[in-house]
């Protein structure tokens, strides 16, 4: 029987915390502020289900284009096409 190709197929590693990172995430990460035009890395925090983006975009880098409620609109280029992802601060890391 063929395996299903559901939306979370192949995400065992992306949606699993390392043993040292298990439990609740640091609250500073969820309330971090980002400015428009700032470069950010998309990294899913498995401990935070809200504001998560599709796992296919995990690991990409984009530019913050503004806020939508408590979340941020991040522009990325996926396969030569510009896309806008809406994601909360818990899943964003500032590029240094």
UniProtKB/Swiss-Prot annotation:
InterPro entries membership: Ribosomal_eL21, Ribosomal_eL21_arc, Ribosomal_eL21_CS, Ribosomal_eL21_sf, Translation_prot_SH3-like_sf
Transmembrane segments: none
GO biological process, one term: translation
Domain of life: Archaea
SUPFAM superfamilies in alphabetical order: Translation proteins SH3-like domain
This protein's record includes keyword Nucleotidyltransferase: no
Keywords, ordered alphabetically: Ribonucleoprotein, Ribosomal protein, RNA-binding, rRNA-binding
One cellular component (GO) term of this entry: ribosome
One term of GO molecular function: rRNA binding
Region described as Disordered: spans on this chain: 1-66
Pfam family, one: Ribosomal_L21e
Function: This is one of 5 proteins that mediate the attachment of the 5S rRNA onto the large ribosomal subunit, stabilizing the orientation of adjacent RNA domains.
Known partners and oligomeric status: Part of the 50S ribosomal subunit. Interacts with protein L18 and binds the 5S rRNA. Has been cross-linked to L18.
Family per similarity comment: Belongs to the eukaryotic ribosomal protein eL21 family.
Classification via NCBIfam families: PRK04306.1
Name of the protein this chain belongs to: Large ribosomal subunit protein eL21
Native source organism of the sequence: Haloarcula marismortui (strain ATCC 43049 / DSM 3752 / JCM 8966 / VKM B-1809) (Halobacterium marismortui)
């Amino acid at each position: 029987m063929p395996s299903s190709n559901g939306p979370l197929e192949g995400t065992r590693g992306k949606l699993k915390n390392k043993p040292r990172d298990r439990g609740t995430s640091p609250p500073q990460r969820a309330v971090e502020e980002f400015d428009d035009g700032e470069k950010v890395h998309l990294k899913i925090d498995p401990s935070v289900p809200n504001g998560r983006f599709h796992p296919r975009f995990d690991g990409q880098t984009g530019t913050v284009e503004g806020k939508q409620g408590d979340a941020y609109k991040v522009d990325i280029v996926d396969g030569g096409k510009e896309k806008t992802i809406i994601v909360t601060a818990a899943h964003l890391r500032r590029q240094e």
